[in-house]
C-alpha cells in the first residue's frame, strides 16, 4: 500500500515539475543602457554642443576603445513637453561596472585626458551654469530567447 501511495505521489510531483521547464520566460537580460536627462538653458545649446563634440566625445570614444562601453548616443527630445529634458545621453554596456572597475577606469581616463577628479569637477561646475542634469536611469535590454 505504501509503495502505491509513494508511486502516486512521485507521479504527481513529476507531473507538476515537467511544465516548469516549459515556463521559462521568453526573454533574457541583455545590455545595460544608462540614460542621463539633460536640460540646457535657452541660448546655450551651442555651448553644450561644443562640449559634446569635444571633451565628451573624446572620453566616450576612449571608453569604447577600451571596451568599457559598446556604444553611446546623443538623443534630442524633438517634441519636448513641459519639464522634459532637451537631450538624453545614452551609454550602452554589457555589464554594470564594479567599484574596483570604476576606480581603475577613472585613473586610466584621467591619465588619457591629462586631468584629475578636481579638474573634471570644476569643468562640470562651469557647464552647470547652463546645463542641468535632471536624473539618470539604468535600463536593461530584454532579448528574445
Q: Which role does the model predict for each range below?
A:
Residues 144-145:
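Short, solvent-exposed mixed-charge patches
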Residues 1-10:
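Bacterial N-terminal signal peptides that target proteins for export
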Residues 24-27, 58, 62-70, 84, ...:
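An amphipathic, aromatic/His-enriched active-site/gating alpha helix that lines ligand/cofactor pockets
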Residues 17-19:
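N-terminal signal peptide c-region/cleavage motif recognized by signal peptidases
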Amino acid at each position: 500500500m505504501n509503495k502505491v501511495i509513494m508511486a502516486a505521489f512521485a507521479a504527481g510531483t513529476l507531473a507538476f515539475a515537467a511544465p516548469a521547464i516549459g515556463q521559462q520566460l521568453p526573454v533574457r537580460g541583455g545590455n545595460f543602457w544608462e540614460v542621463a536627462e539633460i536640460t540646457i538653458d535657452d541660448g546655450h545649446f551651442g555651448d553644450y554642443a561644443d562640449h559634446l563634440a569635444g571633451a565628451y566625445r573624446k572620453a566616450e570614444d576612449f571608453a569604447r576603445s577600451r571596451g568599457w562601453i559598446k556604444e553611446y548616443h546623443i538623443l534630442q527630445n524633438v517634441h519636448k513637453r513641459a519639464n522634459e529634458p532637451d537631450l538624453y545621453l545614452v551609454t550602452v554596456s554589457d555589464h554594470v561596472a564594479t567599484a574596483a572597475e570604476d576606480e581603475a577606469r577613472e585613473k586610466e581616463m584621467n591619465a588619457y585626458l591629462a586631468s584629475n577628479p578636481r579638474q573634471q569637477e570644476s569643468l562640470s561646475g562651469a557647464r552647470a551654469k547652463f546645463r542641468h542634469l535632471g536624473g539618470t536611469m539604468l535600463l536593461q535590454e530584454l532579448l528574445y530567447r
